[in-house]
């Protein structure tokens, strides 16, 4: 009998210590985020939740930086979460399916017959990015990044675009498809997206800080402006008007509560959750998967205007990691990977972020506009003080890190720029590939 009791005790202890991180190393998490803040590699907010309880929060950096003051970020700071909005949209679409107001097999011509291939495109295909609807990008539109655009103008751009492929023959990410789903949601509910969100999600699970972005960022409402690293400080990034699509503002705390409630079946049925989780070409219905620390997580990511967001849920352990940033410098994925490795007690070395100084005289040799006839964008190189900046096309400029007198990197080394001033060339290296750009005169 004593042997059986001892065995049961040891088994219980084993199960406990191999599940939730035995002792969460909060000191190491603190050190990681302190290093990110000190080296100006990120500004943002993190929430880790386990079994419906928050076990760690941390915010670094600022919601607003101006000449007179800096407003620190807090756990309550609100961020644009970009494509994580799609997960909310997918949940509400699946609610309509469960209510019998919509079918995943319904075709788009039921709502927007003017869209090319509308009779062939199903709701399921739009949810899983298999519709072939072209992704309307900012540089295709006629408005300036900060100017508003109406829903009719967005719809006209989508209608004008040629299909990328026949429906369900491949996968291609489409913000435009989810814009149409937002319009369908409004048509079927007779309510605005924001009203539907409040009734169908927020009020059901107690979200207080999640809503549609309708105008420019308002720091007086706790919203965080977006910034780029100038090398010596933070410079406000340009801000795309949110009217180009349905875009949510939220906090890591609300995001964590949302995905936990989703998997707790407080929003949709198990069958609907299973459909969201079923991957085809790495896409589910408003959901993707990640592998961290050898475990499968479900969730989504978002990015735009130098905002970044990551929401990851491990269902067997009921673990949520929600991270938002208003200043992407160090890759968001690398930050989330570090957080999860630390959580599970995996080996993780906090980066030193060592760079070298290059004189302004040397940097000026690299300044200019670089192009390649086979590349879709030109790359503009500028200097501000002792920092070199790169701007692809009309996108935001980003500060480069010098690793040698003629070599610089971006996104933790994912992009490498090598300059040959004598030849007026810039070599862009990514993933084992190299492209030579020539400076324009």
Predicted feature locations:
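Active-site SXXK
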Residues: 33, 46, 52, 60, ...
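Bacterial Sec-dependent N-terminal signal peptides
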Residues: 1-24
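Short, small/polar residue-rich loop motifs at catalytic or cofactor-binding pockets
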Residues: 40-43, 305-307, 375
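Short, well-ordered beta-strand elements
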Residues: 299-300, 310-327
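Short, surface-exposed loop or secondary-structure junction motifs
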Residues: 119-311
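Short, conserved catalytic-motif segment at the N-terminal edge
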Residues: 23-79, 101-106, 160
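Peripheral terminal and inter-domain segments
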Residues: 18-19, 333-441
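Short, glycine/proline-biased beta-turn/loop segments that scaffold the active-site neighborhood
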Residues: 104-118, 203-205
């Amino acid at each position: 009998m004593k042997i059986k009791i001892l065995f049961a005790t040891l088994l219980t202890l084993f199960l406990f210590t191999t599940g939730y991180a035995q002792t969460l190393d909060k000191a190491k998490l603190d050190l990681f985020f302190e290093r990110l803040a000190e080296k100006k590699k990120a500004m943002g907010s993190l929430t880790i939740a386990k079994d419906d309880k928050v076990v760690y929060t941390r915010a670094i950096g600022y919601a607003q930086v101006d000449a007179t003051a800096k407003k620190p970020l807090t756990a309550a700071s609100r961020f644009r979460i970009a494509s994580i909005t799609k997960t909310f949209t997918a949940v509400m679409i699946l609610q309509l399916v469960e209510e019998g107001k919509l079918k995943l097999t319904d075709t788009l011509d039921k709502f927007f017959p003017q869209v090319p291939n509308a009779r062939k495109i199903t709701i399921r295909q739009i949810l899983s990015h298999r519709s072939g609807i072209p992704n309307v990008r900012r540089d295709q539109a006629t408005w300036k990044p900060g100017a508003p655009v109406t829903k009719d103008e967005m719809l006209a751009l989508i209608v004008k675009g040629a299909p990328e492929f026949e429906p369900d023959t491949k996968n291609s990410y489409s913000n435009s498809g989810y814009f149409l789903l937002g319009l369908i949601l409004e048509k079927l509910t007779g309510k605005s997206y924001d009203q539907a969100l409040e009734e169908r999600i927020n009020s059901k699970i107690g979200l207080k800080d999640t809503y549609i972005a309708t105008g420019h960022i308002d720091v007086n409402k706790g919203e965080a402006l977006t910034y780029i690293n100038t090398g010596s400080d933070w410079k406000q990034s340009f801000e795309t008007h949110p009217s180009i699509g349905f875009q949510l503002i939220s906090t890591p705390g609300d995001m964590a509560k949302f995905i936990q409630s989703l998997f707790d079946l407080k929003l949709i049925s198990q069958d609907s959750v299973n459909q969201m989780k079923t991957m085809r070409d790495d896409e589910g219905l408003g959901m993707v998967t990640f592998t961290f620390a050898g475990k499968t997580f479900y969730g989504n990511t978002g990015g735009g205007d130098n905002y970044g967001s990551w929401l990851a849920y491990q269902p067997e352990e009921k673990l949520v990691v929600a991270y938002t940033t208003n200043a992407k410098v160090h890759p968001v994925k690398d930050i989330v990977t570090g957080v999860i490795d630390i959580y599970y007690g995996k080996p993780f070395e906090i980066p030193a972020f060592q760079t070298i100084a290059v004189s302004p005289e040397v940097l000026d040799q690299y300044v200019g506009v670089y192009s390649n006839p086979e590349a879709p964008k030109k790359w503009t190189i500028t200097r501000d003080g002792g920092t070199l900046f790169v701007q692809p096309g009309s996108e935001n400029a980003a500060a480069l890190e010098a690793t040698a007198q003629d070599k610089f990197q971006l996104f933790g080394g994912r992009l490498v720029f090598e300059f040959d001033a004598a030849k007026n060339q810039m070599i862009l290296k990514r993933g084992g590939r190299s492209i030579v750009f020539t400076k324009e005169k």
